[in-house]
Amino acid sequence: MAVESRVTQEEIKKEPEKPIDREKTCPLLLRVFTTNNGRHHRMDEFSRGNVPSSELQIYTWMDATLKELTSLVKEVYPEARKKGTHFNFAIVFTDLKRPGYRVKEIGSTMSGRKGTDDSMTLQSQKFQIGDYLDIAITPPNRAPPTSGRMRPY
């Protein structure tokens, strides 16, 4: 007698991320590119084997959170430690349909404040080994507005 599995796609998708044992799992090399003007790099800066010059190489795991990555970037760039500095994260990945790269914004963090994206992981955002991480850093004096509205009244 044959037994048929009745697992639905929703059940598969809702399965929580399995914790990674950092003692037993080898870390991956994460190539991070940063800007300090609040904007991500242009995709043509990643063309034909070229990459932006602002590369930071981090050994980490797929369960690394955006807050954890923010802390690592702040260790290297002291000016990013100021309270209110905004970090906007994007994954840069190879476009399988045409030559070049695509970008997918995944979340943001802020120095000195807790945020909803702090606990977001690379794994939860479908990051794959070989992708790049692009971080647009905005200093506190030029930070984007916290609310979506800019009204004079």
Swiss-Prot record:
The keyword Plastid does not apply. The modification N-acetylalanine is found at A2. Coiled coil: none annotated. It comes from the Eukaryota. Keywords: Acetylation, Cytoplasm, Isopeptide bond, mRNA processing, mRNA splicing, Nucleus, Repressor, Transcription, Transcription regulation, Ubl conjugation. Signal peptide: none annotated. Residues 1-20 are annotated as: Disordered. One of its GO terms (biological process) is RNA splicing. It is found in: Nucleus; Cytoplasm; Nucleus speckle. GO terms for cellular component: ASAP complex; cytoplasm; nuclear speck; nucleus. One of its GO terms (molecular function) is transcription corepressor activity. Residues 7-20 have a biased composition (Basic and acidic residues). Pfam families: SAP18. Its main location: nucleus. InterPro entries: Hist_deAcase_cplx_SAP18 (IPR017250), SAP18 (IPR010516), SAP18_sf (IPR042534). Residues 93-153 are annotated as: Involved in splicing regulation activity. There is a cross-link at K13 (Glycyl lysine isopeptide (Lys-Gly) (interchain with G-Cter in SUMO2)). Component of the SIN3-repressing complex. Enhances the ability of SIN3-HDAC1-mediated transcriptional repression. When tethered to the promoter, it can direct the formation of a repressive complex to core histone proteins. Auxiliary component of the splicing-dependent multiprotein exon junction complex (EJC) deposited at splice junction on mRNAs. The EJC is a dynamic structure consisting of core proteins and several peripheral nuclear and cytoplasmic associated factors that join the complex only transiently either during EJC assembly or during subsequent mRNA metabolism. Belongs to the SAP18 family. Found in a mRNA splicing-dependent exon junction complex (EJC). Component of the heterotrimeric ASAP (apoptosis- and splicing-associated protein) and PSAP complexes consisting of RNPS1, SAP18 and either ACIN1 or PNN, respectively; the ASAP and PSAP complexes probably are formed mutually exclusive. For the ASAP complex, the association of SAP18 seems to require a preformed RNPS1:ACIN1 complex. Forms a complex with SIN3A and HDAC1. Interacts with SUFU. This is Histone deacetylase complex subunit SAP18. The gene is SAP18.
